[in-house]
Amino acid sequence: MAKLREASFCALACVLVLFLSFVSADTYNRQDKQVYVVYMGSLPSQPDYKPTSDHISILQQVTGESSMEGRLVRSYKKSFNGFSARLTESERKRVAEMEGVVSVFPSKKYKLHTTASWDFMGLKEGKNTKRNLAVESDTIVGVFDTGISPESESFSGKGFGPPPKKWKGVCKGGKNFTCNNKLIGARDYTNEGTRDIEGHGTHTASTAAGNVVENTSFYGIGNGTARGGVPDSRIAAYKVCSGAGCSSEYILSAFDDAIADGVDVISASLGGDTAYMYEKDPIAIGAFHAMAKGILTVQSAGNNGPNPTVSVAPWILTVAASTTNRRIVTKVVLGNGKTLVGQSVNAFDLKGKQYPLVYETSVEKCNNESLTTLALSFLTLTPQSNEQIISMFHTLIMWSPKATILKSEAIFNQTDPKVAGFSSRGPNTIAVDILKPDITAPGVEILAAYSPLVSPSATTLDNRRVNYTITSGTSMACPHVSGVAAYIKTFHPEWYPSMIQSAIMTTAWPMNPSGTDAVSTEFAYGSGHIDPIAAINPGLVYELGKSDHIAFLCGLNYNATTLKLIAGEAVTCTGKTLPRNLNYPSMSAKLSKSKSSFTVTFNRTVTNVGTSNSTYKSKVVINHGSKLKVKVSPSVLSMKSVNEKQSFTVSVSGNDLNPKLPSSANLIWSDGTHNVRSPIVVYTDYASSVDIF
């Protein structure tokens, strides 16, 4: 046996040496090439301009090679101009100097930010919920993710008519992939095919716009009806992510296609590890072009809480994750009869049989076979169990205890939603006077469709396959907001992205701090918890267009050169807007620590989308024991007609800001029917430094 092991080891070593030699040779041949995104701005207006030919010509000039096979990765030629290619560092520099090239930046890997929730938000199924089904059927949600499972009942085309006439997309899902009148589009950028082999994309797509599917559960847990926010709408899947991550060039390709395809809302449950300057962020660049074409991009805040969110552009709606009134709990029964309650999703029924209880640091002493059988049996204990945990720890040292884990169960309570600990927080690390995240939505223990090609635990030891599963993340919160954005669009097809964003933010449920530190305040939940029903009739909205965002960027000291990096066209700063004076639905200002007293003003303009001859009176509510003084001028707005605009100024003053806690208030405009609420946040530099790339 020992000789056999030695022979096997030698054979493996030989194979490894050969493999490494091939890798070394391949690396030498590549000459340290990596994928760069070459951004060339807006498409030229000349009718005879051929983007791909231009891109190939640029590469041929730089590389001296005639064939671009293995060089050109993608051409962006529908909604903006550019390409991605494999270049050396010296080639990158030469490309950057060529005429027509706006910027060149390396492709980065982005990560995925990985049902009763709709009922919890008030968007219930049936006659009690107002719907515009004819328009909903013409609404298209574009999902940027790991693809989709086309056979899922959540995406069945049964009962749907042909795709909307505005749809210009295609179904290129790969082998054995078929679209239908529900799932009307599929594109793959990963060379894996659009079929979802990770599960993430199927889950998010069904949360946003999946069909109504009754009697769904995860092994009986969370049993009920699974559905999206706009079940009668259409879905287009753009696979930009694989198991290796989500590449910049894929994301930009998806924006290029989705804008041209005719989607109404883009849902992107993904992001980087840290916030990037706007001109270096493919999501910010793509979303800017989408905004200019009337398409709202909704992005997850990230799962790095309490660290800052990676989604920081004001033209993107940034979503934090919160709990609902349903909790899934698991009980551990110790050998002495004591019961510990924890939060996890455990589908196993051990039928009362007890197994050895292993403390974390002792796992290395177990053999592989014993760990294999118990690899999926674990849970996170609640803080209330602290004393029992300490007692159990001492028991583990002295004895060899056993325990059994009971199957999880769903319990309902009426506690307020709380922001999940994993949800990334503010402040905004790029534009410090723009409050992020914007809104909070359910993202904990969400039941939705799943890919049958991967286990629910995503581990190789798990052989289970399910059509629906329960998971958590800001990735799950993001499609809830995407669904609500599409829902609003069905009632107001003519609204700009900023109007939809404003409606969602100003009608949100107020949330209370869950703790006494900064990460428990508006930096956690933004404007509050989303309220879909109120959002379709907000009364007033804060409007923003492309020119407003350009003025905002000018206020961040962007010049004509750097502006072109984002807008994709020659733009000059004819006027600057202080970032805090961007006509944003929330108001935020970072102040110097050196000032003991301060006064800061915010200028805003609202548009009446309610009724004519309405009078709105202002009310200010001071939060968290803050000692702010807030003055609104004028304090009354009289709107004679729909679409009328009126401006006002908010002056905030105070003394000695708490360096560890933001001071905040709420401004509410009310006409007796509508309550248009905007959070006001002032803070100093309490946070630790964050690296910005």
From Swiss-Prot:
Residues 26-113 form a propeptide. SUPFAM superfamilies: Subtilisin-like (SSF52743). GO terms for biological process: proteolysis. CDD domains: Peptidases_S8_3 (cd04852). One of its GO terms (molecular function) is serine-type endopeptidase activity. It comes from the Eukaryota. It holds the Pfam family Inhibitor_I9. The C-terminal propeptide is autocleaved. Residues 1-25 form the signal peptide. Its EC number is 3.4.21.-. The active site is at D145, H200, S475. Glycans are attached at N176, N215, N223, N368, N413, N467, N559, N603, N613. It is found in: Secreted. Residues 35-113 form the Inhibitor I9 domain. Residues 354-396 form the PA domain. Residues 117-536 form the Peptidase S8 domain. Keywords: Autocatalytic cleavage, Glycoprotein, Hydrolase, Protease, Secreted, Serine protease, Signal, Zymogen. GO terms for cellular component: extracellular region. Belongs to the peptidase S8 family. This is Subtilisin-like protease SBT4.10. It comes from Arabidopsis thaliana (Mouse-ear cress). The lineage of its organism: Eukaryota, Viridiplantae, Streptophyta, Embryophyta, Tracheophyta. The gene is SBT4.10.
